[in-house]
């Protein structure tokens, strides 16, 4: 038996090996940690690093490049900095920071990286989107035309919000800012229960620098009210590093853009951007960027403008989806002229201004109607709301003016006294308990009772009881009237509503 191998066979094997030889050399940009403190790692050797690029450390923790010098890169660490030490290797990934997005995140509580923190298992999301993305251009947008109902009378009637709008909620601490945002999320349930998946309003609540106990309480309230099923909660608590607090709103916005860009509707609440600006200031100072006014870096305006500009009502060509933003700003002693508040006021399409003085008077929601404005929302109001709410703002302004005058104890003529009496009743009508949103027809019926003069004979102390009785009467005995108000508030419907209001007011004579 001949076991010799011919030179031809050897040559054939060598040729095959040469042809199939993969000579690709993989090039990695690898550096070494030369110092780490306060969540900032200084890395030497990342010559090909780009601004905003994701870096992976030897132990698997990620970071993002936010500073580049001639031979070093400053990387903000996402995670426990104690597990990163001097001499550790760090590698560029060539990718920008992205997060999981999609319907799979609904009903879950996640951190700024999209990792679940609610103990309910992993999230099987098939799509990821970058956290930083350019806002839609002018051509890709359309005007705000659809209303976003909050369920709060004073807002839906006087400071209406439309889908795709950015409406700032601003006020001192403990004046009910978060309460308005949570009520708005809860109010979407009634709408979502009766419409298709495409028409639902999905919600995202972003907690930035909040106490974990406060976030847990909000999540529990959303769960009890049935709102968590269409809501994503993104939490970067006070105990989390500033890097997570900085990233959270951008990550949440990317999650919201998934709905917007797929022809769906989304509401996002940033609670709050004051703490976000403080986190960014701390990070910028650690990165040795030059401080400006109030020690904020020079690009603090761009910090929020590039975030809020991503909220938009898309054109029909782009799917017609929307992303509505409700940023929250906390003021100090009612000072709206401070640096960050004025920045965000100039970026948004209006503001709901909450005042401590009004809050302590028991007028809640504590909205200052005179200082609050919605620049584009009125175009989205329904016809029935416009008919009823048109005169309310003017009559309240007249009431406030006369109220200040009446404090001097001067004699007041009959007409002025009538304005004062009706104004007091209207202020009482605009009060609303937390977690008790009203539908649009219910709001129209209640406000119409005040503007029509039907309550002139009802004492101010009985107004809240009258409201309860009117809503009970309408829901139990006249549901067709409520649906008529929603569709078209004709004179016939008005007459029937006046009859029902008269029937209820007769109990207070």
From Swiss-Prot:
| Location, primary (coarse class) | membrane
Keywords in alphabetical order = ATP synthesis, ATP-binding, Cell inner membrane, Cell membrane, CF(1), Hydrogen ion transport, Ion transport, Membrane, Nucleotide-binding, Translocase, Transport
Q: Which reaction does it catalyse?
A: ATP + H2O + 4 H(+)(in) = ADP + phosphate + 5 H(+)(out)
- Residues that bind ATP, according to the entry? 171-178
One Pfam family cited in the UniProt record for this chain: ATP-synt_ab_C
Site (Required for activity): residue numbering on this chain: 372
Note the CDD domains from the entry.
ATP-synt_F1_alpha_C, ATP-synt_F1_alpha_N, F1-ATPase_alpha_CD
Q: What does this protein do?
A: Produces ATP from ADP in the presence of a proton gradient across the membrane. The alpha chain is a regulatory subunit.
- NCBIfam families xref list: atpA (TIGR00962), PRK13343.1 (NF009884)
Name-wise, this protein is ATP synthase subunit alpha
* Organism in which the protein naturally occurs: Ehrlichia chaffeensis (strain ATCC CRL-10679 / Arkansas)
Gene encoding this polypeptide?
Answer: atpA
């Amino acid at each position: 038996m001949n076991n010799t191998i011919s030179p031809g066979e050897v040559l054939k094997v060598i040729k095959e090996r040469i042809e199939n030889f993969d000579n690709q050399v993989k090039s990695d940009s690898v550096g070494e940690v030369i110092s780490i403190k306060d969540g900032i790692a200084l890395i030497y050797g990342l010559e090909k690093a780009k601004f905003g690029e994701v870096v992976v450390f030897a132990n698997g923790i990620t970071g993002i490049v936010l500073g580049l010098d001639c031979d070093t890169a400053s990387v903000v660490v996402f995670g426990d900095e104690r597990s990163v030490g001097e001499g550790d290797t760090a590698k560029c990934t060539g990718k920008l920071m992205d997060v999981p997005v999609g319907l799979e995140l609904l009903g879950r509580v996640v951190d700024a990286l999209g990792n679940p923190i609610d103990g309910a298992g992993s999230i099987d999301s098939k799509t990821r989107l970058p956290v930083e993305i350019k806002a839609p251009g002018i051509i890709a947008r359309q005007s705000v035309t659809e209303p976003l109902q909050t369920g709060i009378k004073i807002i839906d009637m006087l400071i209406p919000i439309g889908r795709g709008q950015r409406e700032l909620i601003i006020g001192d601490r403990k004046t009910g800012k978060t309460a308005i945002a949570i009520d708005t999320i809860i109010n979407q349930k009634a709408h979502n229960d009766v419409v298709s998946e495409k028409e639902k309003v999905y919600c995202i609540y972003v907690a930035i620098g909040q106490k974990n106990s406060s976030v847990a309480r909000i999540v529990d309230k959303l769960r009890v009210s049935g709102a968590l099923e269409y809501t994503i909660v993104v939490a970067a608590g006070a105990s989390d590093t500033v890097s997570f607090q900085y990233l959270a709103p951008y990550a949440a916005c990317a999650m919201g853009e998934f709905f917007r860009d797929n022809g769906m509707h989304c509401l996002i609440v940033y609670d709050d951007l004051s703490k976000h600006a403080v986190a960014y200031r701390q990070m910028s100072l650690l990165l040795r960027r030059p401080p400006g006014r109030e020690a904020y870096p020079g690009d603090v305006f761009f910090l929020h403008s590039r975030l809020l500009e991503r909220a938009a009502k898309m054109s029909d060509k782009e799917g017609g989806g929307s992303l509505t933003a409700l940023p929250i700003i906390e003021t100090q002693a009612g000072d709206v002229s401070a640096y960050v508040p004025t920045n965000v006021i100039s970026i948004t399409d209006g503001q709901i201004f909450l005042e401590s003085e009004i809050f302590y008077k028991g007028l809640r929601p504590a909205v200052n109607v005179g200082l609050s404005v919605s620049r584009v929302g009125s175009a989205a109001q329904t016809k029935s709301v416009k008919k009823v709410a048109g005169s309310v703002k003017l009559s309240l302004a007249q009431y406030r003016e006369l109220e200040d005058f009446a404090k001097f104890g001067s004699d007041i003529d009959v007409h002025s006294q009538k304005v004062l009496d009706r104004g007091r009743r209207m202020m009482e009508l605009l009060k609303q308990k937390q977690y008790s949103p009203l539908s649009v027809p219910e709001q129209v019926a209640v406000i119409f009772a005040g503007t029509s003069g039907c309550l002139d004979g009802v004492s101010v102390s009985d107004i809240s009881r009258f409201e309860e009785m009117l809503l009970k009467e309408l829901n139990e005995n006249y549901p067709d009237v409520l649906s008529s108000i929603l569709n078209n508030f004709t004179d016939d419907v008005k007459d029937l509503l006046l009859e029902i209001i008269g029937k209820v007011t007769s109990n207070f004579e």
